[in-house]
A protein has these predicted regions:
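Charge-dense, intrinsically disordered terminal/linker segments
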Residues: 1-16
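Acidic/glycine-enriched connector segments
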Residues: 12-20, 28-152
Length: 152
């Protein structure tokens, strides 16, 4: 996949970085792990340490594969799990933001955080499958004027 990425300085909550932050999201029903692995490998080859992979922290489907392959390939990796999840060492936000009561809105807040933090969003969508969370992240990214690539 050809990603036209430029070295940008981004500021998120008073943090400046020169890494290109690539949010990779997708349905829990997404099963083509080879496409995800190939994308992350291509990013590693093209950008190396200048890339940061961003995910939503789900264990199943696309998010689970993103985490697995980003860490296996020793990529910079950050995640924004929903606030009712437990904090882990890959979370961007502090531990005090996690282990909260469950609300459906936690997922939408997480999707917005991914869109705001990332420079580009790559969305893996399983054909003929509803993926409201992935669509939500795409919508927020478009509102933020971020580049969005959809892979089926």
């Amino acid at each position: 996949m050809n990603l036209s990425l430029k070295k940008n300085q981004r500021n998120y909550k008073n943090e400046t970085t020169t890494r290109t932050k690539i949010g990779i999201v997708g349905s829990r029903a997404y099963t083509n792990k080879k496409k995800i692995k190939d994308l992350i490998f291509d990013i590693k080859q093209k950008l190396g340490d200048k890339a940061e992979i961003v995910s939503g922290g789900q264990q199943d489907g696309a998010d689970g594969y993103v985490k697995k392959y980003a860490l296996e390939l020793d990529m910079n990796y950050t995640e924004f799990p929903p606030m009712h999840y437990k904090w882990n060492m890959h979370c961007k936000l502090p531990a005090s933001q996690y282990d909260r009561p469950y609300y459906v809105s936690n997922f939408h807040k997480r999707n917005k955080q991914i869109a705001e933090y990332s420079d580009i969003i790559v969305a893996f969508i399983q054909p003929n499958t509803e993926s409201n969370g992935t669509r939500s992240t795409i919508k927020y990214a478009e509102q933020e004027k971020k580049l969005v690539k959809i892979i089926m």
